[in-house]
Design a protein with these regions (language model features):
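Canonical Radical SAM [4Fe-4S] cluster-binding loop centered on the CxxxCxxC motif
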Residues: 3-46
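Extended hydrophobic secondary-structure segments that form protein cores and membrane-embedded regions
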Residues: 9-12, 65-71, 98-103, 248-250
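Short cysteine clusters
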Residues: 18, 22-25, 266, 272, ...
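Radical SAM/AdoMet-radical enzyme domain recognition
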Residues: 48, 52-53, 57-67, 76-208
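Radical SAM enzyme [4Fe-4S]-AdoMet core and its adjacent flexible, acidic
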Residues: 140-148, 155, 159-267, 271, ...
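Flexible mid-to-C-terminal extensions adjoining Fe-S/redox cofactors in radical SAM and related proteins
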Residues: 291-396
Length: 396
């Protein structure tokens, strides 16, 4: 990885504050880092302007992405984002600005949808399947179901021609229903899907930090092999019916690896780094999964994003992924597609005795093995200048 050329920042204007109480949410635990968050949870205009100036200045490429997340980013209100767009236009310097926005959908209405459409926001909606699967975990703070409101949000976005995709957390419940989940997401109009494996461990005082190795999994975490089987079931439908029409992040990333293209998903890159998380007060961390004091890079009021991106701590964090890879990974036939996965998930014992083997290894191996024939065929099409989507005719 070429550190310092560009960086991505997942910015959280409301920190961990959210209007839901999802039973599996790892980010609610981060509120302990900011105990006064309930009184000071909104990013100031000063911090917003400084962030936008620095994010644009930190990029040595022509496209600048702003990724708004949470907590729940709608809680800060539309005027905040109108100001953000104003600052982006003021400081863009001819660069192309792209805004992405990840939401639980609860507050989405015609006003929000109109704003998103007006400014070409790409909106990600968190939804875990149909009502029975979604409402098992994603509930309000009073324990009420949320699926109906989320489905209404999707419908509202579609009516206003807002480009949206879906993010589905694969957990202990919906992992058993891959076909049901996939067909449901298709039915609501999702044309790009992300399937995120839920892997969380529980320490005595809450969720585990990365260095905590010998503690139990949470009961809502996905089973590794079952995650692979989930992906395989979805893949078998997708390649026969929907390739070329529906994008699935993990499938596209795997094909890119087979074709020798640069990884677009940090989980499967050889190194980490330059994919930061920023809290409402300007604190910047190495990664959204490593929002702990020891991984804090600094604050944008004292140090610029470019300085953090080019700094030694970021370089060290990035190269640590490669150095800490398990021995099994170096010998694995799927190393080119996986590179040991996310460091957050490396806590199982490896052959060397170190606790650095990825929890999801069995699932990834099942997926890579199952899809190898199709991936190889699509690579051949790609090398001939033919769209890999043409493989659909072979599998019909």
């Amino acid at each position: 990885m070429m550190f310092g050329k560009s960086c991505q920042v997942m910015v959280k204007p409301t920190g961990s504050v959210c209007n839901l109480d999802c039973k599996y949410c790892f980010y609610l635990e981060k509120e302990k880092l900011y105990p006064d968050r309930k009184n000071h949870y909104k990013m100031s205009e000063e911090t917003l302007e400084l962030f936008i100036r620095q994010q644009i200045a930190a990029q040595d490429i022509d496209e600048v992405i702003f990724a708004w997340q949470g907590g729940e980013p709608t809680l800060i209100g539309i005027p905040f984002y109108r100001k953000a767009v104003e600052f982006q236009q003021r400081y863009c310097g001819g660069k192309t600005i792209v805004n992405t926005f990840q939401t639980n959908g609860i507050l989405i209405n015609d006003v929000w949808a109109t704003f998103f459409r007006e400014h070409d926001f790409l909106v990600g909606v968190s939804i875990d399947g149909d009502a029975a699967l979604h409402d098992e975990w994603r509930v309000t703070r009073s324990g009420k179901p949320t699926h109906e409101k989320v489905e209404n949000a999707v419908r509202c976005l579609a009516q206003h021609d807002v480009e949206f995709n879906t993010l589905t957390v694969v957990n202990r419940t919906n992992m058993h229903h891959p076909v049901q989940v996939y067909r449901y997401l298709k039915s609501i109009g999702s044309r790009y899907m992300q399937f995120i494996p839920l892997v969380e461990r529980c320490g005595e005082n809450g969720l585990a930090q990365p260095q905590d190795k010998h503690i139990a999994m949470t009961p809502w975490s996905v089973d590794s092999l079952q995650f692979g089987q989930f992906l395989n079931a979805v893949f078998d439908i997708w390649i026969r019916e929907d390739i070329g029409d529906i994008g699935i992040q993990l499938f596209e990333q795997t094909l890119a690896a087979w074709c020798g293209l640069p990884p677009q998903v940090c989980v499967f890159a050889p190194t980490c780094g330059s994919a930061f998380a920023m809290e409402m007060n300007g604190d910047v961390y190495n990664c959204d999964h490593f929002v702990y004091p020891q991984f804090k890079l600094g604050n944008i009021h004292q140090k610029t994003l470019r300085q953090m991106n080019q700094g030694e701590q970021n370089r060290q964090f990035g190269s640590d992924k490669q150095r800490s890879m398990a021995q099994e990974c170096h010998r694995c036939q799927w190393k080119f597609a996986c590179y040991g996965g996310c460091p957050k998930h490396r806590f199982l014992p490896s052959a060397s005795g170190a606790t650095n083997h990825n929890y999801l290894c069995a699932g990834y191996q099942a997926f890579f093995s199952h899809t190898a024939t199709a991936m190889s065929a699509m690579r051949t099409l790609y090398e001939k200048g033919i769209s890999p989507a043409e493989i659909k005719s072979i599998f019909v």
